[in-house]
Amino acid sequence: ITLEAKGNEQQVNLDKLTVAALEGETELKALLDWQQAISWRGELTLNGINTAKEFPEWPSKLNGLIKTRGSLYGGTWQMEVPELKLTGNVKQNKVNVDGTLKGNSYMQWMIPGLHLELGPNSAEVKGELGVKDLNLDATINAPGLDNALPGLGGTAKGLVKVRGTVEAPQLLADITARGLRWQELSVAQVRVEGDIKSTDQIAGKLDVRVEQISQPDVNINLVTLNAKGSEKQHELQLRIQGEPVSGQLNLAGSFDRKEERWKGTLSNTRFQTPVGPWSLTRDIALDYRNKEQKISIGPHCWLNPNAELCVPQT
């Protein structure tokens, strides 16, 4: 380790901090100033980093450069990464990260381009979440996730778009994944489609379909979630087929933004469980008052071939 630095009561200037490790070298140059706001400027360089000996199950060879600057003042912050480059390989998978971005505590972001690549898999983010306008795209194209991370497998492809304005944002999503595996969990297919807008009230639709969820003692053939409508009138349907639990429910409701009150009805609800089938004998009325942090649940009964469980209004 070698260190070259100087400073005073107002700032510290780190001319060079060099750490020789992992068969390579890491070098940091930085300036930290606190005269008025806390501000920083830094440059981190990775040269010939090799983790094969220390982490044989996760061998990596990396080179890179990360430049950053920013400030923190009065509970607000801003930061910029004018240069981000990382190259090399991880477990024989090529690694490439390249991009620039800047943002602040008001969640305003400008991303001219951020590209991530691991083997045949890639993801890209580009656009801005501005003071007024929103125009951001995020894409993923991962045809070969097998062993990209230990225990991971499958494919994924999708697109997320943010459009509109800060006053009336719109979110569109279309994502598909197949043959997903993580350790002992496997999922044959996942599909997510959504189009959500927010103007004077939130409205849109969301469809989620998940097929063949498997792990020890769990085998779910199909899960579907469908939601649509607006704040004033919306509905949701959930269906589950599999073991040890299967079933369905419908939820319909309306939200009064002025009163901060949501009223709804839970209906068409039944489940098959290890202790037999259970079903509602009547719809359940639900009433949530956000100002009072209070929820009321109407009286209802759950029916089983061998029992009936009734709950008074709560």
Where are these regions (language model features)?
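Interface amphipathic segments
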Residues: 1-314
